[in-house]
Amino acid sequence: MQIAWVALGGAIGAVARYVLSNAVYAWLGRAFPWGTLSVNLLGSFIMGLLFYLFTQRLMVPEALKPLVLVGGLGAFTTFSTFSLETLNLMQSGSWSLALLNMLSSVLLCVLAAYLGLVVGRLI
């Protein structure tokens, strides 16, 4: 049954990623992978927040954890798209944007997860 919960969360997370990243691209354009960066930042923050709340503060059903954390946020965030977009920037000769994407994605997503944990502690 747990696999079904992960699959349901994955379906919801994938659709949410598609909608949000396309909205960001429509707003900011596609010269830089803003859509992927935005979903990864938001997903990292939510992952840190909910991980802390689920393990330290809230009594949630066990089925909810894999549904939200593994399925939902796992499908919402995307390392493979980040990798492909970075390679595309490199192949087009935009090395500075590729480096910016690598550094900002890794550093800011780890910072976002940490901030999520901090906010969870404050709630």
Curated annotation (Swiss-Prot):
Q: A single GO molecular function, which one?
A: metal ion binding
Chain segments annotated as transmembrane: 3-23, 34-54, 67-87, 99-119
The entry's protein name is: Fluoride-specific ion channel FluC
Task: Please provide the record's keywords in A-Z order.
Answer: Cell inner membrane, Cell membrane, Ion channel, Ion transport, Membrane, Metal-binding, Sodium, Transmembrane, Transmembrane helix, Transport
Instruction: List the gene name.
Output: fluC
Source organism per entry reads Magnetococcus marinus (strain ATCC BAA-1437 / JCM 17883 / MC-1)
The record lists the catalysed reaction(s) as: fluoride(in) = fluoride(out)
The main location class comes to membrane
Q: How does it sit in the membrane?
A: Multi-pass membrane protein
GO cellular component terms?
A: plasma membrane
